[in-house]
Design a protein with these regions (language model features):
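A cross-kingdom marker for long, charged
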Residues: 170-171, 180, 186-189, 193-281
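Acidic/His-rich structured neighborhood in mature extracellular/periplasmic domains
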Residues: 21-186, 201-203
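N-terminal, intrinsically disordered, polar/charged segments of Gram-positive cell-envelope systems
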Residues: 1-23
Length: 281
């Protein structure tokens, strides 16, 4: 069943003054991407060690990939080889690394979300999140799909994780996190399951999902923030994360329907960043 369309204000963005657009753009950059990034109340614990132990992460392949990107930092190596009791911080320097460690977690962790997913079946390896995961011992990431009990959830925690997964989307497609057919979906699922296992509420998980998606799809969320401010009159800190992460704004089709046509009216006043997002390692 398609979601209800959003109620849009009658504001015509083509009438907004260029100086206001520029000022709101700069403000949105600061609000979405603080200098130190976002630190969230989720810890990796021993989840990555378990992924290495079962072969879902091949440490040598992982190191080799990052050699061409300047190498892994001491801290990054540490969280791949030791339990981590530190809260996760996401920023532009580590957003790709976090994507690549959370991806196999969401892919390999045994959970009803994956059990009930359209991915579950003989063709599981045909999806970008499974077949595209080549940093395990086996080059076919599909062999790790829904296989290991890495994060255990109580029935209450499962209900929370399931609800958030079913109601969060990503701009590269029209599927919810509960259908994690690409790396961003699998990574967000892993993060949501971790957070739920550590006692976070639905509200916290929607907020954290929005923060991570913003760093993974920066241009898209800058435009969503501008849409909220210039079209709807809502400052980014006051935006409802559950609404912003929903189909109407965070899915590819929703964004194309509601956000892009409005932003296209002012696009010539916006900086052209050209920061594309890929669904591979």
């Amino acid at each position: 069943k398609p979601p209800q369309p959003p109620i849009l204000s009658p504001t015509d963005l083509s009438q907004v003054k260029p100086e206001q657009i520029s000022a709101e753009y700069e403000k949105a950059v600061q609000e979405l991407f603080p200098t130190d990034g976002w630190t969230v109340p989720i810890k990796l614990g021993d989840s990555l060690l378990k992924l290495v132990e079962v072969g879902a992460i091949d440490l040598e392949k992982f190191k080799k990939l990052y050699e061409s990107r300047g190498g892994l930092s001491e801290e990054q190596l540490r969280i791949l080889t030791e339990p981590s009791d530190e809260e996760i911080t996401i920023n532009f320097e580590n957003s790709n690394f976090l994507l690549n460690i959370l991806w196999p977690l969401g892919l390999a962790n045994k959970n009803p979300v994956l059990e009930e997913s359209p991915m579950n079946g003989p063709l599981v390896s045909r999806f970008a999140s499974s077949g595209g995961w080549i940093l395990g011992k086996d080059n076919d990431g599909g062999v790790y799909f829904n296989k290991f009990e890495i994060i255990r959830l109580t029935p209450e925690e499962q209900t929370i994780a399931q609800y958030v997964a079913e109601n969060t989307y990503r701009p590269c497609c029209g599927n919810p996190t509960s259908f994690p057919d690409c790396n961003h979906g699998a990574a967000l699922l892993g993060l949501i399951e971790l957070g739920a296992s550590e006692g976070l509420t639905q509200e916290q998980l929607f907020d954290i999902s929005l923060k991570f998606n913003s760093f993974w799809f920066p241009e898209t969320y800058l435009e969503i923030a501008l849409f909220y401010k210039l079209k709807q009159g809502i400052d980014w800190p006051k935006v409802n994360p559950e609404e912003a992460m929903g189909y109407n704004f965070s899915s590819g089709p929703g964004w194309l329907t509601y956000v892009r046509p409005e932003i296209d009216k002012i696009r010539h006043f916006l900086p052209q960043e050209g920061n594309g997002t890929s669904c591979g390692v």
